[in-house]
């Protein structure tokens, strides 16, 4: 097992990509902790994947985030791996139709929320080193025609640059920071973004050289590489998975 007894925190781990990552990491021997404000969904996921520990926490609340980290440290003694995965997709709107509340909601969850968790974790991780994995998107690397999600793409591009910055800042503490840029993945969140899921999935699949859209498992195995000692000499890397 590649993650035997490692303590892993996965934000957004109760569904979609985060759930797939959590499930694989548990199989690899990790003690996985999932924070979320949706307790019902948390309990369901924790039971399904045999999750070690789950905590009610709103990623938009500094107090909730700090309390969650304090509970984890008290119970497990430290955090070896942080997966910054939580994220939401906006309703498709062009720039002139976006109001500040729309913008702020996406930025608060997709960017500032990841900052909150990383800041709270890194103080403890500095003691023994660790790995931070940021889940971004290919929408943070390039623009797509008719994809009206300005706050989303801004948040994902920002996570890419924070990956590079944090990798340099904390290399001397033996903390590796890497990023995965996922393309279109078959999740409930992605499907809710499309008006006609079946047609959109088929058309999107055709745009990929391998002829299909991604699965949570595709992203989970890429995350496992960055979480494990297989990538012990890798930091600041941006890995497209598409």
Residue map of PLM features:
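Active-site helix of classical SDR
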Residues: 118, 155, 163
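Substrate-binding pocket helix/loop in short-chain dehydrogenase/reductase
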Residues: 93-95, 102-105, 200, 204
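Residue(s) in the substrate-gating loop at a strand-loop-helix junction
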Residues: 137
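C-terminal substrate-recognition "lid" of short-chain dehydrogenase/reductases
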Residues: 2, 175-176, 212-241
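Conserved glycine-rich cofactor-binding loop
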Residues: 14-15
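A glycine/serine/threonine-rich, flexible loop-to-helix segment
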Residues: 47, 146-148, 179, 184-207
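Alpha-helical segment proximal to the catalytic Tyr-Lys
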Residues: 123, 168-172, 232
């Amino acid at each position: 097992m590649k993650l035997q007894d490692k303590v892993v925190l996965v934000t957004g781990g109760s569904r979609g990509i985060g759930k797939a990552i959590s499930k694989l990491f548990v199989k690899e021997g990790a003690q996985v902790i999932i924070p979320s404000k949706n307790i019902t969904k948390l309990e369901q996921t924790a039971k399904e994947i045999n999750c070690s520990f789950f905590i009610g926490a709103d990623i938009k609340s500094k107090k909730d985030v700090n309390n969650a980290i304090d509970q984890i440290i008290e119970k497990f003694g430290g955090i070896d791996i942080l997966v910054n995965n939580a994220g939401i997709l906006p309703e498709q709107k062009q720039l002139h139709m976006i109001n500040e509340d729309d913008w702020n909601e996406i930025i608060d969850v997709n960017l500032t929320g990841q900052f909150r968790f990383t800041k709270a974790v890194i103080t403890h991780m500095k003691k023994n080193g660790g790995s931070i994995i940021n889940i971004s998107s290919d929408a943070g690397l390039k623009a797509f025609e008719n994809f009206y999600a300005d706050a989303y793409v801004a948040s994902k591009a920002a996570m890419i640059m924070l990956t590079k910055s944090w990798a340099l800042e904390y290399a001397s503490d033996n903390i590796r920071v890497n990023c995965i840029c996922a393309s279109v993945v078959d999740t409930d969140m992605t499907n809710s973004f499309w008006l006609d899921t079946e047609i959109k999935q088929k058309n999107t699949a055709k745009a990929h050289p391998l002829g299909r859209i991604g699965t949570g498992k595709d992203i989970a195995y890429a995350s496992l590489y960055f979480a494990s000692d297989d990538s012990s000499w890798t930091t600041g890397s941006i890995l497209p998975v598409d």
